[in-house]
């Protein structure tokens, strides 16, 4: 109550920010008459003037009024469109490292031209980020004329472009592309073997369109570049045969492990667990199928991967449904985005889940992959010097934007008042009662010529509604992942009088629904339309537009509530654009997933008390409040999952940044001989110390072991025992110096044969390849650590702190291994002629290019860790008894962790 009172007196933070910015808007409006008088050449010259002022030290913010006035005037001349005052406000918010919430139809694309132009003046680059390639190309082409009029260059970053074309796109003042492609280019740049292979500049300013979709919905989705791991498709097929024999536990009680069935399902967490009976049943079935030997256990050390396959197969059968979570097209399992309803070509679930679904559907099983490089969108976008975003629905996620990305959300007022009527939810007892009511509502409204948009949350539900409409004789269009090719066309005509469009999660974001249909689309369909034809089309559209307004505007029907209020708001936001009339209503049933899992008992009891009869609907503020609370519960849980994922990924991110920084420094220098000499001395010292401890007596020396190690690992054959016999007074320090001198001389002989320049190139290549190889193994080890770290909680230890501590120790050990491997490789390598070295380098480059193309987006669903399937650890060098312990202690393996083995 007190907060509301204070807000009323002083205004909210949002109000105060807009009040401050309105002063700048007034300033821009005062400048407008002066800018109108400028010739085209004088207006274009403003860009040169602004850049000169920035070079002299003027702040970017000081240019806002003049720069925005320049863009507004240029837009009027190029597009015939003038930025509204609210769009100027939006532009300032976006320049101010904030998120601008702008309603559908308020012109976000035109608003983005303001901060994009301003920040491009610095010459450091602007990245406009969109959710798909179509929008990236569309927005770039639509705005190209404006930016080129003002003297700025435009680049489009698309998948599959060759490196020179990508480099050119990134060198442009403003680059358009998708979040995936920007992220992949960052990872590829950090796998490059020469500075010329890199394409990105330093990350300066990112302007993210549909920011909620990219920074919230995609936050659990790591970007991964991967290579093939071992083939285990036969095992997936065998395990898949077992699952149909298992029985689901009927009652999900607290002690699910002791239950009657073979497995229990937790729908809230989307997890499935074997019961004690289930474990026994699975073991018996695996023995009968010949997968396991008689008497073996699933939890035997050798069968750990079996358990991984069983869990993946169970989840595939129980939690993932065809035409809801994925579709099967041309013998391929393609994931359906739960937030947009679009198919996600090229994405694969991790942890063997995708292979398990492929086995379930009987299609070809693709190999599991091993991660070579990965990053989450959360950590990628935080690399930018300046980040901003815009969307129609951000206010419900304002806390998350603030806490994770340090971005404030500012709600921009609409240019015209919103007059859409949002009707209360109607709740029915059963699914069929609800669908019957929806069909009746559609028939009544279309009879009056009112267009209707029906939003469903899955392809399966959209097809059920479509079948019922067909049965009722109602003509309609269906827009879901199966028919996405006609998306823009269907959405553009969804505002025709009496039109009925069924859309899955409103997949048509980016295309406005215009009341009366799109006259631009009609004109575009004609070849060389005459002026008379254009006038006739516009006149016909005006009649249709007025008829739709008279019928009440576009009516939105939601067939059930989504887990997130934001997705519901996106659906509602399709109606009532630019002050148009419209209405919306959600129809729910007690059989809906959200109601069944999160709100069932309370609402069902409430409905019984209110005396519900079959076919009747309840419309009550209590029910609406209960549903809103259920959505908040889910949103809160999903936020916790994303936050926890980020906390763990932050640990890996610190290490990633250190490795990539070191790698880039290495790429940018041509001579690493000093570094090699330093680590060679360090490695030899550590090796000698493990056999001849400093300040020790000669009886403690393991001379034979040292000779063997130097010969095996460094190709350095030295008669150390003979030296000690010939020189009984040979001091420990003198012996060390002699060994180091022999190693140095051996290395110089190799350098003389191959040539100094070729040796420098070879040293650099070995360092890069060894670093990449060990980093890949380190990523796998980090994933394994992450998967089991929660068990530390049972020992009263904080899993996050344990993860930080152990991952740091692993990182330190990796750096020690890096030094050892580099020196060992350079010492043992057989010297070849320069031509052979160049040929090997070319083969290496071709192989790295092939691997870089094997990229995938590992889609991690809300309930699984962001851990990838990384089984390939067999290439690891076996640690000898006299080798330095991998923990980095400096002791022999047999005297350190070897004892534990």
From Swiss-Prot:
ATP binds at residues 87, 105-109, 512. The keyword Metal-binding applies. GO terms for biological process: intracellular protein transmembrane transport; protein import; protein targeting; protein transport by the Sec complex. One of its GO terms (cellular component) is plasma membrane. Residues 839-901 are annotated as: Disordered. Its EC number is 7.4.2.8. It catalyses: ATP + H2O + cellular proteinSide 1 = ADP + phosphate + cellular proteinSide 2. Residues 841-850 have a biased composition (Basic and acidic residues). Keywords: ATP-binding, Cell inner membrane, Cell membrane, Cytoplasm, Membrane, Metal-binding, Nucleotide-binding, Protein transport, Translocase, Translocation, Transport, Zinc. The keyword Lipid biosynthesis does not apply. GO terms for molecular function: ATP binding; metal ion binding; protein-exporting ATPase activity. Zn(2+) binds at residues 885, 887, 896-897. Part of the Sec protein translocase complex. Interacts with the SecYEG preprotein conducting channel. Has a central role in coupling the hydrolysis of ATP to the transfer of proteins into and across the cell membrane, serving both as a receptor for the preprotein-SecB complex and as an ATP-driven molecular motor driving the stepwise translocation of polypeptide chains across the membrane. Belongs to the SecA family. This is Protein translocase subunit SecA. The gene is secA.
